[in-house]
A protein has these predicted regions:
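Sequence-structural signature of mature extracellular/luminal beta-sheet repeat domains
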Residues: 1-216
Length: 216
């Protein structure tokens, strides 16, 4: 999966359709997510309803100019952050409601495992705090109705064909939440805006010198 067509081209898709988040490894390699190779940002809801692994994780090495896909078949991969060990990273899959860990160096190179699963909402960006814990922004909370729809592909197909797009079921993105998670995947704390009045749809949060900065 390498090509020299341009710095940010990969062989299985000459154009980056929806790059999302990135982080830089200690050796300068850039790891970034492409949320979907099928849809534009304005069509995010279609990707959510499709529920397929249309996304991928990509590595660009400035030293060689190569760009390659390292993981594919991901369900709207979103936030990416390098772990403290400098050999692995965490990435969010928004519609799968999970965080995974991938080792790009070291003895476990190429290994992928679930870090945090069955989250109560849809993870967006994630960042490592000054104490080594991770801050995960949930852009919205899951509902039983949408969860049920995601288990029924036939229902989703009929809905898309017979109902106007502005009346489709959508993920709930009107309630903000931020999770603080340990290096082992244990949820330490959760900050909520249950009414969605002050910080609805939190997409990212960063900690700096003890202060937390949410973005919505």
């Amino acid at each position: 999966d390498e090509t020299n067509r341009s710095l940010l081209s990969v062989i299985d898709d000459s154009r980056l359709r929806l790059p999302d988040d990135l982080d830089i490894a200690p050796d300068g390699r850039i790891f970034f997510s492409e949320a979907t190779i099928r849809y534009e940002m304005s069509e995010w809801a279609v990707d959510a309803l499709e529920g397929r692994g249309n996304g991928r994780l990509i590595c660009h090495d400035p030293r060689t100019g190569s760009t390659r896909t390292i993981l594919r078949g991901l369900i709207f991969p979103n936030g990416v952050t390098i772990c403290r060990d400098g050999q692995s990273l965490l990435f969010a899959e928004t519609w799968a409601c999970r965080i995974s860990r991938y080792w790009f160096d070291g003895p476990d190179k190429g290994k992928r495992e679930i870090f945090l699963d069955n989250l109560p909402g849809y993870p967006d960006n994630l960042n490592r705090g000054s104490d080594g814990t991770y801050w995960i922004a949930l852009l919205g909370m899951r509902t039983r109705t949408f969860d049920l729809a995601m288990r029924k592909p036939g229902f989703r197909r009929r809905m898309a064909k017979r109902i106007a797009a502005d009346e489709w079921l959508f993920p709930n993105i009107n309630r903000g939440c931020v999770l603080r998670v340990s290096e082992t995947g244990e949820i330490i704390d959760a900050l909520w805006d249950e009414a969605g009045e002050n910080h609805p749809s939190i997409t990212s949060t960063c900690e700096h010198k003890g202060w937390l900065y949410p973005v919505s």
